[in-house]
Amino acid sequence: MLTSRHWSPTSSRPHAEGIEGNALRYGLFYGADIDNVAAMLRRRMLPVVRNGGEIPFIHHEDAAAATLAALHHGRAGRAYNIVDDTPATFRQLVTGIAEHRHAPRPLVVPQRVLAVAAPYGKALFGGVSMRVSNARAKNELSWKPKYPSISDGIQAQ
């Protein structure tokens, strides 16, 4: 357990003699939960915005494989982006799940509706693009996503 003695007054990073680590920055997880998403679509409970930004996703199996790779090959003090190869919008993810599970396509709502109903959702899915590279993880961890896109990951479920 990290306690106050592990924190330097001049740094925001923990430190302890003989302990090294790295940081894994995961994309948004998806995978085995797609049946829950399809159920929400059937009840018309999962709207999307028309022009959302691209965000990084990661299939849960790929996240687990990357975590193991980091334990074996990760370099101390390094940060790794654990994301697939193809950024996508939340709308693309939800629409792909709808098609794969034969559920209704999501309702498309204006961003201002999402801002009122779900401010955090609007901030995350409503236009902000967060494109990141997984090149360091691939090179240094000897890892690559089994599902390089949300389309590949959805089809595997």
What is each of the regions a protein language model found here?
Residues 5, 16-19, 28-39, 61, ...:
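Glycine/proline-rich active-site loop of Rossmann-fold NAD(P)-dependent oxidoreductases
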Residues 148-157:
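Amphipathic terminal alpha-helices
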Residues 91-95, 115-144:
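Conserved C-terminal active-site "lid" loop/helix of NAD(P)H-dependent oxidoreductases
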